[in-house]
Amino acid sequence: MPKTVIIPPGTGTPIAPFSPGTLADGIVYVSGTLAFDKDNNVANPDDAEAQTRQVLETIKSVIETAGGTMDDVTMNHIFLTDWSNYQTINKVYAEYFPGDKPARYCIQCGLVKPGFVVEIASVAHIGKT
């Protein structure tokens, strides 16, 4: 099964050996996405609303670069550092998924750098390769 690496225009260099997304068999797999600034530092440290919005915009960019839309998302994997941010993350999340909601799960855990509060990985079915 061939795969295509998805790198949206203007995307910075990842800090680890991964691609922002891959497309295979009509499915877009979006890597775990964090809110980095242009210098690969934490953007909006400890701000759940701003980070969630930035993360979802980045995910949207990957999916749109692959030829899909956020309506094509079938699964989200959400990692948060503190359950006290859960409702804030949900509020922003609902803006990006106003209709039928994709499947998802949330896990509380530590993230790669202090100041990050949310990481999201997504899967979208766009029906083409």
From Swiss-Prot:
EC number per UniProt: 3.5.-.-
Membrane-spanning intervals of the chain: none
Keywords: Hydrolase
Catalyzed reactions: (Z)-3-aminoacrylate + H2O + H(+) = 3-oxopropanoate + NH4(+)
An example molecular function term from Gene Ontology annotations: deaminase activity
GO cellular component entries: cytosol
Pfam families: Ribonuc_L-PSP
Group of enzyme by EC: hydrolase
Listed GO biological process terms: nitrogen utilization; uracil catabolic process
Function comment: Involved in pyrimidine catabolism. Catalyzes the deamination of 3-aminoacrylate to malonic semialdehyde, a reaction that can also occur spontaneously. RutC may facilitate the reaction and modulate the metabolic fitness, rather than catalyzing essential functions.
Family: Belongs to the RutC family.
Protein name, entry field: 3-aminoacrylate deaminase RutC
Naturally occurring in which organism (per UniProt): Caulobacter sp. (strain K31)
Taxonomic path: Bacteria, Pseudomonadati, Pseudomonadota, Alphaproteobacteria, Caulobacterales
Gene: rutC
